[in-house]
Amino acid sequence: MSTPTDSKAPLRQVKRVQFGILSPDEIRRMSVTEGGVQFAETMEGGRPKLGGLMDPRQGVIDRTSRCQTCAGNMTECPGHFGHIDLAKPVFHIGFITKTIKILRCVCFYCSKMLVSPHNPKIKEIVMKSRGQPRKRLAYVYDLCKGKTICEGGEDMDLTKENQQPDPNKKPGHGGCGHYQPSIRRTGLDLTAEWKHQNEDSQEKKIVVSAERVWEILKHITDEECFILGMDPKYARPDWMIVTVLPVPPLAVRPAVVMFGAAKNQDDLTHKLSDIIKANNELRKNEASGAAAHVIQENIKMLQFHVATLVDNDMPGMPRAMQKSGKPLKAIKARLKGKEGRIRGNLMGKRVDFSARTVITPDPNLRIDQVGVPRSIAQNLTFPELVTPFNIDRMQELVRRGNSQYPGAKYIVRDNGERIDLRFHPKSSDLHLQCGYKVERHLRDDDLVIFNRQPTLHKMSMMGHRVKVLPWSTFRMNLSCTSPYNADFDGDEMNLHVPQSMETRAEVENIHITPRQIITPQANKPVMGIVQDTLTAVRKMTKRDVFITREQVMNLLMFLPTWDAKMPQPCILKPRPLWTGKQIFSLIIPGNVNMIRTHSTHPDEEDEGPYKWISPGDTKVMVEHGELIMGILCKKSLGTSAGSLLHICFLELGHDIAGRFYGNIQTVINNWLLFEGHSIGIGDTIADPQTYNEIQQAIKKAKDDVINVIQKAHNMELEPTPGNTLRQTFENKVNRILNDARDKTGGSAKKSLTEYNNLKAMVVSGSKGSNINISQVIACVGQQNVEGKRIPYGFRKRTLPHFIKDDYGPESRGFVENSYLAGLTPSEFYFHAMGGREGLIDTAVKTAETGYIQRRLIKAMESVMVNYDGTVRNSVGQLIQLRYGEDGLCGELVEFQNMPTVKLSNKSFEKRFKFDWSNERLMKKVFTDDVIKEMTDSSEAIQELEAEWDRLVSDRDSLRQIFPNGESKVVLPCNLQRMIWNVQKIFHINKRLPTDLSPIRVIKGVKTLLERCVIVTGNDRISKQANENATLLFQCLIRSTLCTKYVSEEFRLSTEAFEWLVGEIETRFQQAQANPGEMVGALAAQSLGEPATQMTLNTFHFAGVSSKNVTLGVPRLKEIINISKKPKAPSLTVFLTGGAARDAEKAKNVLCRLEHTTLRKVTANTAIYYDPDPQRTVISEDQEFVNVYYEMPDFDPTRISPWLLRIELDRKRMTDKKLTMEQIAEKINVGFGEDLNCIFNDDNADKLVLRIRIMNNEENKFQDEDEAVDKMEDDMFLRCIEANMLSDMTLQGIEAIGKVYMHLPQTDSKKRIVITETGEFKAIGEWLLETDGTSMMKVLSERDVDPIRTSSNDICEIFQVLGIEAVRKSVEKEMNAVLQFYGLYVNYRHLALLCDVMTAKGHLMAITRHGINRQDTGALMRCSFEETVDVLMDAAAHAETDPMRGVSENIIMGQLPKMGTGCFDLLLDAEKCRFGIEIPNTLGNSMLGGAAMFIGGGSTPSMTPPMTPWANCNTPRYFSPPGHVSAMTPGGPSFSPSAASDASGMSPSWSPAHPGSSPSSPGPSMSPYFPASPSVSPSYSPTSPNYTASSPGGASPNYSPSSPNYSPTSPLYASPRYASTTPNFNPQSTGYSPSSSGYSPTSPVYSPTVQFQSSPSFAGSGSNIYSPGNAYSPSSSNYSPNSPSYSPTSPSYSPSSPSYSPTSPCYSPTSPSYSPTSPNYTPVTPSYSPTSPNYSASPQYSPASPAYSQTGVKYSPTSPTYSPPSPSYDGSPGSPQYTPGSPQYSPASPKYSPTSPLYSPSSPQHSPSNQYSPTGSTYSATSPRYSPNMSIYSPSSTKYSPTSPTYTPTARNYSPTSPMYSPTAPSHYSPTSPAYSPSSPTFEESED
């Protein structure tokens, strides 16, 4: 029973959180311990002591007692605070730094601010920092820091501010004029020190007690309090000193009771007892007047205990310990860190209604299912509200109780009482009433959330449907492993059961697995076909795979969408055989088109002569849902963009794509069962010749290595530039050995036959790669550690049994054996070394990337798309104007090609310019009418000209956007594929002329682009913004749908073009980002997830001389930390003019940049004693010395006898382009007259500099010092030598250590120019790359291109070029890191991160220094890092948290304003009046699941018609129509009531299991007859609700008079839907009873059934996915007596008006039944007896026996309904079947066994022989093809009955509809006014 305190009233939302400091008064008022806690003891005589630490007033101590304050027991009493009065104030350790800051801002003596509040600077500060008290204190502190004299005050003269006030003058001015001490903190003490200017006052230093500080702070006025960034109401400065200490309630510090032992008190209690002891000691001593130093000691002690209560890990402070010696856990430690209060208990908690167990695979589940063990299903519950519709079912579950499955655990009454069914309650308690809740067991098709940690991206939690299975593990489909990153080696996963209908609705419509197939991270699928299925698909689709009749029969049984027709076998004689491709074609749903290649496709084939026939069958082509050629593999069924699954998702919607996964697996796996695939040792053995080749290759590699070693020994090896000899040698050896591995691997792979199982797996892509093959068969290859060969471990060898200095391959880790042959011990050892490195790397990387991801998420968690389309953070600051700069979401965009960018002018003109003058061509392309229309009109030519001009200008702007000729763009609406689809749908014959006028095309494209808007609004800025957002899309549309292409290439007809344009618009609208989408979290996950795939350490490029680049995780860290000192800063310097092309000139620039010191060009230096300048001791220098000293220009006597002789390296000098003169010049400039420097000629043999010291004039006379001097001279020369070598810059920029010059390796670094002919040409020009950066200086050098030169040091770019440049730079650097690993992340995520980092105009690092310095709420900041500091800060400044972010709301347990929570719903009270009352008289009789449809909103799937979705803006929420329906823009198929497979039905009814649908657990249960006619009005056709609930999306029962279809309804506004449209006329075969689609005996074909009308199942290319097929009567497993025909099956739902038994028009007893009934008035044409639809068909004619009032129905002659039929319980008397029973009411033609039309098994057949006696097939003579259907007259070539697509075998293809969708055939009929060229739909928008 729940306690009475739990109120049912909803809690108010917390609007904001105010932080502050508890004032002493407040602590006392709050406290329940009068007089404070004074005793350190807890108990006294076995009872808790009053005034002790376990004071009974503070809370409950054990389970038996009650609280003395609130009289609650343990569960009710929250605990109450006490307090301790401290004898002396002490500092609060959390606020001590703040205290010092405040002290430094106010006068030590008079507490006035050191700067007058009236100072204009202060006023400016207050203005600037409004609402940001933290900043205010910082500004004021900076202002006051320098002041040493108190001069505050009101009437102070501001002019005197900077003058020293006269010390003799009386201190006035309101301040006190005292000198201010400087205040310092040491440990827990503050010291004040006066440094005095006046001579008379001595310096003094005193310790400032907390009491003194408290006095100072107490006197700060409220006004100044505010200026100092505090708050007089919530946080006064003096409250930062502790005078009264709150004692936390007992609930916060519970004692642990050990049985038999004493209570173990909590750490906080221990600490508090220390404080009380110290406090009492101090009191006692003070009272007894002890010595001052004793009292000081006591105060210190108290101070220490109070400090360690709060924070016990202060640096430089002893820890407070327990007796056992482990440090106490202070309050700070409780809050901070991952396990702390904030992150451990508030941000993340353990939850109820969850389960966790091991996962195992099950290929027979659909991807959106999860197998749940029965034991778990019996334990987890879902609270279901009892309604009149489910009360019987619930009663049954309650009766079964908890012990049996399915049952229930609890009943929750409407007053909140819980009845536990485990403890056999009284039977009277079990009675249910409407409004009770039953917590029932989990059962099939309940929605749950499935999750695997680590949850790295949103696809790690997805919605699934339960499938209860035996045994104890979760079962899941194999395709789901990739998004979860799961495998079945013991992984465990979690399952969460949502507890409300709203949550379930969200899971179903947003979260369910099929909707997550595509990841926004890289706009490609995350799930593909994997493992054995992939191997099997590749095996099965090979050319030589044939399947016998028996096997085909067997396989088709596993295909739920099979339509009971065997396809034509491809081989008839000697026996019928089908190919694997044929079987696969049956699985492919709908109208899907695709061209891809197989993994082994040779590229040269595309240009070669065989490009059409593909000799190896490697070109995959799927056309119209048929696999025409090609072998499928991972490329077409894997997770790549543009794979079959991706296309299927985009074209046919998530639901079909989801089923497609399952169907592939069931069929293919069952084929694999009799094909088989096993791999053994035999598959790894190659033939002897291959082994010889391998041996040869390895031998050759070893010889090569020996040669290289030889060369290196003899110094013949030329070091590559930039590398030492040793590096060059290592690189060479490594290259030789790696080539050897690859070569042997190649020959090994070649030796494997087509039938090799290992190869089969590699080729299909399911497991393994070529490296694996070569390592298993040929050789394992070189083992590396840290990117180098195995290093020497000890004494110059790797292992003890190799000789010293062995550089050969074996001893340095080359493994020449294969895994098959086995490794030698030393090889094994090296292999283990390499492997160990990999493991360590992975482990370290996981931690690193995990932290990176957490920081990214915390930085961007609350960034969301708002309703104005902008992207903002939680504080409402603008991050982006449109998400991703184009306002589109990442899932629905694809890679497309911009056709115009790369073309040369000539081919551009040839392909895009429409040449009207070429008459022969025109006659071939257009019909005569069009040509006539064109020649008559003058504007036509102008329009075409204008179009051409527009294309040219488009091309120019594209070339500006993509200056390097990049033509791949990411845009919605894949035009090539859509055009292909159109050609299929409308059967475009490319050889016939088209009736589409070019003017029509131009206008159509123009209106289309006017309607594809991202930024609405007509002002200039909005228009410009929209132009920017949609420019690429516009260019793509204009170039693809230019008149020339549309007419000549595609030959689209007028209606095909109209359809295409409408389709593009719809898709474009669908691709827009939804408001409420949390794009920040998405972006963070999309970047964090690829980071886990990067390697941690940086491999240096082997070989070429190039700078080392930091890559991978370390570089990523540098970028997002914005590190000031990157590991490898570097500039890429592009050159201009001659320097770019001429290597010599480029070298000049290089020399000007590279920093050169004297050391770099010096060969050797020496110091000589050479006393005679003229006759030198070095004979080779004699010559040039003579030249110099013949005519000395200085006093030779001053020269020192010591000589520094520097010999320079000629090669390096010329390399650096230096001359001797330059160097001497530099020396002279540096040392001036003090040195004498002479040098020889630049062309001499040796370049020599001779340097001597010049002694000063006066020195030469001091003889006695001379000896010393000599000594000094040579030492001095030494110093000078060292200084010159290292510090003297000869040339270059100091920061740039080395410059590499090379030609660009990649196109991106080449200069791209556009030639005269308009082609792109990449010119390789010299470029320089540097180690070290100094951008400012480099940019100012001549010959440097200032535009393209860039740095990889982000901070530097910011300083030099500003914020916009740095934003681009961050994006470029991130991209470079990702691309190095071949990862692709959609631009929008990178852009969002860059924008978050730069939005405020400075760089915000993604670290605590960036994220926590933002203006976000304190709660959000404290949930990231520095928890306690942030909270203390917030308290000191009295911040308020506005509760707008995600973290804040989660901490408070509220729904954050995001996703579906970022808007409110309004109730339309008007509509409620039309709601259907459920009369109480129904009692329990009205039960079927179908009856659920009566209450409009009773199931989530029915609400859509009332929501704005009807404007088709958010198509992602109504599934199957998702995209196919999209093909009928705005057509009825969009009716959201086709919302999902289950939609009209009760939420868990799944068409795939009619037997188990909850509404019909068995024929025995729940008869549906609302007994009283009083209900009938509820079904009147005008009720707005019934339309929504009619399961048949667009079946004729939508009477046009229903408000939903009224022409004013927004969706159907255009005249097409007026009741006169052919939609409802007899030609509309989709609805005519003769339509073959509706086999009357199959419930699924009844026009009411959801599926039939669900457009996505309608038009499917190979009879797939029309679920109806599964139930057709011919299919053996659905005999008419099977329960799926039971009248309770929802297909006969009474709510569907056409069968509604209770609706007066059908009740046989009701007088209104006469044909003259007013109900049949022409107002409701679809029911009017004159409606040809109903009258022409025999079963509706009033004469038809169906209308007879007698119960002919049950005539025993009708075999179908004979009473013994098992499905009717054999009891004709059973209430359901009384002739009065409404569902057999004669009105319902369905049940008239005598109607010749409707009983295929009945002996009579209608004379027209519409249904051939076999019942299931429909002969071509069926009226379906009768000529009276004007459109498809047999004369029409396109639709001749023989047209293969319409073979009667393809039953669900209603041939009348080009799209094949029975739902909206008239839509596509070319004669339909809806598509007439004047159709309003496409001229003016349907608002």
From Swiss-Prot:
User: Is Transcription set as a keyword in this record?
Assistant: yes
| Record: residues binding Zn(2+) 1 | 67, 70, 77, 80
State any single GO MF term: metal ion binding
Which top-level enzyme class is recorded in the Swiss-Prot or TrEMBL entry?
A: transferase
Q: Where, by residue number, does Mg(2+) 2 bind?
A: 487, 489
Residues where Zn(2+) 2 binds: 107, 110, 150, 176
* Positions of the UniProt region annotated as C-terminal domain (CTD): 1579-1881
Name its cellular compartments: Nucleus
Query: Which intervals of the chain are annotated as region Disordered?
Result: 156-178, 1528-1565, 1579-1887
| sequence repeat ranges, renumbered to this chain | 1579-1585, 1586-1592, 1598-1604, 1605-1611, 1631-1637, 1638-1644, 1671-1677, 1678-1684, 1685-1691, 1692-1698, 1699-1705, 1706-1712, 1713-1719, 1720-1726, 1727-1733, 1740-1746, 1754-1760, 1761-1767, 1777-1783, 1784-1790, 1791-1797, 1798-1804, 1811-1817, 1818-1824, 1825-1831, 1832-1838, 1839-1845, 1846-1852, 1853-1859, 1860-1866, 1868-1874, 1875-1881
Polar residues bias spans: 1651-1664, 1776-1786, 1814-1831, 1850-1859
- Regions annotated as coiled coil: none
Enzyme Commission identifier(s) = 2.7.7.6
Listed under GO biological process in this entry are: transcription by RNA polymerase II
Q: Where primarily located?
A: nucleus
> What's the stated role of this polypeptide?
DNA-dependent RNA polymerase catalyzes the transcription of DNA into RNA using the four ribonucleoside triphosphates as substrates. Largest and catalytic component of RNA polymerase II which synthesizes mRNA precursors and many functional non-coding RNAs. Forms the polymerase active center together with the second largest subunit. Pol II is the central component of the basal RNA polymerase II transcription machinery. It is composed of mobile elements that move relative to each other.
Other comments on record: The binding of ribonucleoside triphosphate to the RNA polymerase II transcribing complex probably involves a two-step mechanism. The initial binding seems to occur at the entry (E) site and involves a magnesium ion temporarily coordinated by three conserved aspartate residues of the two largest RNA Pol II subunits. The ribonucleoside triphosphate is transferred by a rotation to the nucleotide addition (A) site for pairing with the template DNA. The catalytic A site involves three conserved aspartate residues of the RNA Pol II largest subunit which permanently coordinate a second magnesium ion.
Q: Which NCBIfam families match?
A: PRK08566.1 (NF006336)
> Subunit details for this protein?
Component of the RNA polymerase II (Pol II) complex consisting of 12 subunits.
Return the similarity comment.
Belongs to the RNA polymerase beta' chain family.
Q: What is this protein called?
A: DNA-directed RNA polymerase II subunit RPB1
